[in-house]
């Protein structure tokens, strides 16, 4: 479901304008770096404000893509990076659809945000992504319930590049202190769990160039 995004690279994030806030963020970055699980802080656009070394290690092998790198905007990465499924297991239902739900909610709250609008335009330019957003997302939410759209507490599959881990479940935990929340930020951590799955190869569907393959989540029209 990922595709090559055609939008422009997001503009640099504004730096908080008080010394106190900047000092807090610098100290919080030290705290974040001390965590062993991949962690990141994002704003309402999913622009990555900061991320720790474990997060960078998880996605270090991603080939360069101008508008959809995990350390720039995590929403764009999940939706648009052609290799996101190499790390994010069960990519469509585990990651893409929940993130589409978050985009939809963000647009309802921040409808005039230029970056969110740009992401929505990039979705509209791709027939598969547009079908997922308009048809697949409501169908999926109806099938699994609103709770499945929440990230906090969700268990997701990672295909960890460390061969000692391989396919590994993680629990996404949102833990945002008040000072970050006041800035419009949220912190998410991927708590790696002990490997409870057989280390079988995890296959993901590949999309042929120029072929509008049918998304599994989009209901098939009846004849």
Model-derived features with residue positions:
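Hydrophobic protein-protein interaction segments
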Residues: 19-42, 48-219
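Short amphipathic recognition helices of helix-turn-helix/homeodomain-type DNA-binding modules
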Residues: 1-22
């Amino acid at each position: 479901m990922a595709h090559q995004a055609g939008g422009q690279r997001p503009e640099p994030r504004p730096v908080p304008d008080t010394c106190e806030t900047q000092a807090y963020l610098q100290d919080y970055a030290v705290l974040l770096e001390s965590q062993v699980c991949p962690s990141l802080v994002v704003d309402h656009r999913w622009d990555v404000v900061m991320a720790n070394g474990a997060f960078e290690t998880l996605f270090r092998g991603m080939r360069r893509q101008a508008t959809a790198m995990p350390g720039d905007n995590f929403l764009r990465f999940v939706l648009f990076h052609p290799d996101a499924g190499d790390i994010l297991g069960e990519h469509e239902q585990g990651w893409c659809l929940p993130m589409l739900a978050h985009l939809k909610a963000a647009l309802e709250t921040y409808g005039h945000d230029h970056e969110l609008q740009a992401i929505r335009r990039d979705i509209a330019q791709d027939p598969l992504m547009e079908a997922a957003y308009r048809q697949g997302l409501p169908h999926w939410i109806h099938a699994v319930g609103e709770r499945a759209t929440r990230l906090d507490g969700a268990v997701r599959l990672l295909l960890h590049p460390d061969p000692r881990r391989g396919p590994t479940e993680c629990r996404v935990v949102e833990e945002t202190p008040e000072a970050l929340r006041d800035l419009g930020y949220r912190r998410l951590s991927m708590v790696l769990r002990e490997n409870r799955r057989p280390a079988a190869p995890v296959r993901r569907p590949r999309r042929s160039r120029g072929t509008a393959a049918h998304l599994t989540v989009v209901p098939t029209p009846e004849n």
